[in-house]
Amino acid sequence: MDTSSNVFHYQVLWTSDKAKKVKVWKDGTMRFHSFNNRGILYDSDNRVVDDFFLNNKRIVLDSEIEFNRTIVYVENLQTTTEANIPPIPRKSKLSETGKRPAYLLKPFQPPFHSANSDVSNNSNGALSSNMLKTHAHHTNSTKSTIFRNANLQSYGVDDSDIGSLRCSSKHQLSVTPEIQPKAKFRPNSYLASSVEESNRANNTSPYPPSNSSVTALPKPSKIAYIPVLSKPKSFNGTLVEDPVEEFGEDDIASDFFSSPSADLEADDFTTLNNSNAGHLLQNLSNDNVSVSVKALENGNEEVSNNHARSPHSSRACNTIPSNKNDGLNDDHQRQDSSVAEPSPTSKRLRLTRLPLPLLRKPTGKRQNFINITVTDPSKNLYERSVKTAAELASLQNVTETTDNEIPNSPDFLDAASEEDEHIPSLDSSSLLTPLALPNKKAFQPVKFRVPSFSSPLVKPASSSSFGRSHSHLGTSLRSNELNGSSASSSIFLQSNNAVNPNVSPSTVLEHAKHPSLAKHSGVSLRTGLLIYPKYANGSKRKDGFGATSIISSGEHSSLPKNSKSRNVSVFSSPFNVPSFTVSSSDQVQKKKGNVPNAIETDSSPSDTISSSPTVRAVNLSPSKNQKPPKILTKIPDIFSKAGKKSPILPTFQESCSLPIEPFSSNITDLPFVNTVTLASTSSKIKRAKLKMLKFKHAMTTQGRDLDSDEDGDFI
């Protein structure tokens, strides 16, 4: 096998501007190794610039080869040399190349300790602090369990303290023994002899004697005592109930949350009694805890008093016997407690409870839990609700609230009860004057209709005068959805106060300035509405067709039939603006007479409106047998000149039969439940109807004939 191969040396130009159009070329050489088809680029100083594997490629002169980071232009071949091929490394030859380093051959080991180390004579000797456990002792848990006694002997803990260690690990928070750093480790022979001697001396050891060989003893390791919280026992062996499990509302006074453990902080029973300790000794002086009182009654009082008054009895572990010592009587318990009582001069470790953290007693939150009350008044919702229910039950006659904001009757429609009464109003004398239209044109009210999306507007079949008269009422409705029949009614039709007989008769319709307008205090600057007191007093009754009629209080009066007058039926509106039905064949007089804001006056200026009689009754839907009341007033001509009187044709009377009204404005018929919503809705209705009146006036002042043009209807 050849151990050398040819290497071709080429003179090249190279550049690192692979992406640029204008490239800067530099001189260099390229060596092509034929055994692995690798090209290496060198610069003019013989430094490696780039390399590339030219697999299945031939090097051609005057050609460009793209390397990894550069472009090489091959000019000519300079020379050919031979290079030795290095051997291919194999796994079998790894051991022949040399030894592996020590850190790869051996795992990590702790520092070595000589076997000739001195053994200390101190009985409390322990392992040095630099002695570490190996990995084998973590996995070998069974051996460490068997020889736990021997390990305890290696720490200098006698066999008499082993029971106290085991007892403290179950019932108390224990600490690990202090490790003295200068103590040395004892050899295995001394460990075996000490274990055998301790087993012979104390036959009360719960562990069986070790029959294994000395060499089977593992290296002792530091034992960690895990504290386990369990139920404490009283002095006669009965279990005290855990306050966490028996968490009642009546015996929370001895709650362990509210006070620290006074086990290590007080050496006298008097200090324990004074402190608010949630400990076992505190329960002796606490009357709320019944379990500790029963323990005192059943048990021996002498034993309890001895344990309570001895300063170190709370630290002795055997005062709380384990389950294995339950068969012992009280005498044995006293002996064990005296044996296990450590003397203050002894150098043995004193196994005590770890002190619990001092917890501040909560103030203001947990004062009295018996009454289920807290000092914070916002938390006593249950008590407040019970007290409120009791107060409400004691009240027999609960009076209705008479709040102006939440009315109890239809008086909320009174505009005087709203905020408009504090707003200065305009003078109402200008509102009662008739509207002066330009070019002497007649005031023609607009035909209004409620927009119906199901059927077009259809006028009711009636006489020509009836149809024309209803075109001046305000609207002509087609409401098959509401009544099932076509209906024509006034847009100003209102009977809000027909239900309330308690309305004071302060707003009876007057005739001094206008036959159907009541007294008002002016126009509201905020809403633009006329501010009225309460509506007219009336009662509600049914006609033959079931329609509603408003019969005002007072006598019914009418003029003689042969007097020169016209039938004008006045309909009540929310703001008392009248609309008229004039039955006459004279269309010119009709066009002049239908003014919504003022009634027609006589041609002579000397005649006043106040001379017309008072309107007493309005009947909307008369039956066939009952004729409508004839409301006859003098209607003077407004637009005729002062000196001339237009001829008045003899009038004839027609019975106006309206079907059942499609819309009702009664409070009981409105689709609202809340009276507060009704109060705000009524003002919105007033504003909407005022906008309709303004729209009528604006459209008629433009001089448009809106009788024929229905495109200008208000929607």
UniProtKB/Swiss-Prot annotation:
Residues forming coiled coils: none
Biased composition annotated in UniProt, kind: Polar residues: 301-326, 472-481
BP-aspect Gene Ontology terms: double-strand break repair; resolution of meiotic recombination intermediates
Sequence ranges of Low complexity compositional bias: 202-213, 601-614
Disordered: region residues: 192-216, 300-348, 461-481, 580-630
Taxonomy, superkingdom: Eukaryota
Transmembrane segments: none
Any Pfam family matching the protein: ZGRF1-like_N
GO cellular component: cytoplasm; mitotic spindle pole body; nucleus; site of double-strand break
Name this protein carries in UniProt: Uncharacterized protein C553.01c
Species this protein is from: Schizosaccharomyces pombe (strain 972 / ATCC 24843) (Fission yeast)
Lineage: Eukaryota, Fungi, Dikarya, Ascomycota, Taphrinomycotina
